[in-house]
Swiss-Prot record:
First-listed, main subcellular location of the protein, grouped into a coarse class: secreted
Gene Ontology annotations of biological process type: proteolysis
Name by which UniProt lists this protein: Probable zinc metalloprotease PTRG_04977
Family: Belongs to the peptidase M28 family. M28B subfamily.
Gene Ontology MF annotations: metal ion binding; metalloexopeptidase activity
Signal peptide (UniProt feature, chain positions): 1-18
Length: 483
């Protein structure tokens, strides 16, 4: 069916500039610009047209709001306190103690996860996924690396999977020092505590699609546990449509005392790695200006849209990078496996409290100590993860085979995709933005069709297509390639 949006000229809403946005989703303050000029306004679809309406972020429904309210800062504090009590959780630490070391922590996490799963009426299962890592970088002797995974099986589309992880291993200054205490309260007991709290909440609320909540190991030695998890999922052809990595999400205070307790950064890679995208497609992406519309960045935009609101009390600041300088994270292995993945990290880091021997020098306390963790902030980050995961799982799957016609030299845009046979899909939306805008700014519901012709030049805007469920939830947008 052909849908011509020009017929909807009565739905004109002019685009908003910086002073009109509903809430801020970027970390830096906006740079002053001429608000009267559509060419300078990042939130404008230039040139102005009478197509579509201004995009309004997806609000949480009553069920999601109630779930978000279940996230407990007290539970997160108790979990971090317990993880710190194991002394060190270094990947190479003692294996034969029930009170100290990585295995003691693993067993406790698994025990707690199983308690949560017992409340799920069989919809949540817990697995300890282990393998023996031979001698390798930062691994001087063979060691068992274990991931604790709680899987909430989807009620309607269980083959579609979303993953969230935090890593439970820790370290001090010397990455091979597995004897000294390494509390790892922020890095990354905070992310592990969020994964566990999400498991507790989701055990009582079955999602439509499957959600895996993981406490992974071997991160500090080289992302071993998460890479193994990603490759295992890839080797079994698991359809992972999104992965969230929570790492260093426990403090709102930076090393200069600056505080930003209501913002979380979301790191999102640009062009996918060559292991996930062919060289031909990578070249095409650059040719058509799609370097800012990788699956990872669409996932980050989705998180900013559904999780930055008054239910979570947070803003999501998208950072257009794989990760911070000189650092890496557990989302990397998922990206290399071809899965969309992003990393959440606190807005202002204090490096005296990361990867440090516990000590005091010149009045400065070093070490990843629990006294530096903001439990309310960590709980709010958990709410961002919950809102994102639940909104992903309740929405229809992303549209498939989305293409734009690049064979005709004109000022219309022809986009097509495969219509889903799912009864949950109510319609599709075209979203778009200026090429200099970070987030989608405009949308047009085109019904349950698989082809649309828009009186907007593909040269001037960036398009995406997303599926809309009968329940109101919307999928992440898919960027169209020529086809």
């Amino acid at each position: 069916m052909l849908f011509r949006s020009a017929l909807l000229s009565n739905v004109l809403l002019l685009p908003a500039c910086a002073h009109d946005v509903l809430f801020s989703r970027d970390l830096p303050l906006p740079i002053a610009a001429n608000a009267e000029s559509y060419t300078d306004c990042a939130n404008a679809a230039w040139p102005p047209s009478n197509v579509g309406v201004e995009l309004v972020p997806q609000p949480p429904d009553d069920e999601l709001r109630a779930m978000v309210d279940e996230m407990s800062a007290e539970n997160i504090e108790a979990t971090i306190t317990k993880l710190v009590s194991f002394g060190t959780r270094h990947t190479l630490s003692t294996f034969n103690s029930s009170t100290r070391g990585i295995n003691a922590a693993r067993d406790w996490i698994a025990s707690e996860m199983r308690k949560y799963a017992a409340e799920s009426n069989g919809t949540m299962t817990v697995e300890v996924q282990s393998y023996v890592q031979g001698v390798a970088s930062r691994i001087p002797f063979p060691v068992t690396i274990s991931n604790v995974l709680a899987k909430a099986t989807g009620s309607e589309d269980p083959s579609r999977v979303y993953v969230m992880t935090g890593h439970y291993d820790s370290r001090v200054t010397d990455v091979l020092n597995y004897e000294s205490d390494a509390p790892g309260a922020n890095d990354d007991a905070s992310g592990t505590a969020i994964a566990m709290e999400l498991a507790r909440v989701l055990a009582k609320h079955q999602p439509k699609s499957t959600i895996i909540l993981g406490a992974v190991s071997g991160e500090e030695q080289g992302l071993y546990g998460s890479t193994y998890l990603a490759q295992t999922l890839k080797n079994t052809s698991t359809n992972v449509e999104g992965m969230l990595n929570c790492d260093i999400v426990g403090s709102s205070t930076g090393d200069r005392g600056q505080k930003d307790p209501f913002t979380i950064r979301a790191f999102a890679q640009g062009p996918p790695p060559l292991s996930a995208e062919s060289s031909a497609k990578a070249a095409q992406r650059l040719q058509i200006g799609g370097e800012n519309d990788s699956p990872a960045r669409e996932l980050a935009r989705f998180s900013a849209e559904v999780a930055a609101n008054n239910a979570t009390g947070m803003k999501v600041a998208i950072i257009y990078r794989l990760d911070r300088f000189l650092r890496g994270g557990d989302h990397t292995g998922f990206l290399q496996a071809g899965y969309p993945a992003i990393r959440y990290t606190e807005p202002n880091e204090n490096f005296a409290h990361q990867h440090q021997d516990i000590r005091t020098e010149n009045g400065t306390v070093y070490g990843d100590l629990i006294e530096f963790v903001d439990f309310d902030f960590t709980a709010r980050v958990g709410k961002v993860n919950l809102a994102t995961l639940w909104s992903l799982a309740q929405a229809p799957a992303m549209p498939r085979n989305v293409t734009i016609d690049a064979t005709i030299l004109d000022n219309e845009s022809r986009i097509k995709w495969i219509i889903s046979n799912s009864t949950d899909v109510a319609s599709y939306e075209v979203v778009w933005r200026s090429t200099i805008a970070s987030l989608w700014t405009h949308m047009l519901d085109v019904g349950k069709v698989g082809y649309v012709v828009l009186p907007l030049s593909k040269d001037n805007v960036i398009f995406g297509i997303r599926a809309v469920g009968k329940n109101g939830y919307k999928s992440p947008a898919v960027y169209p390639f020529p086809g």
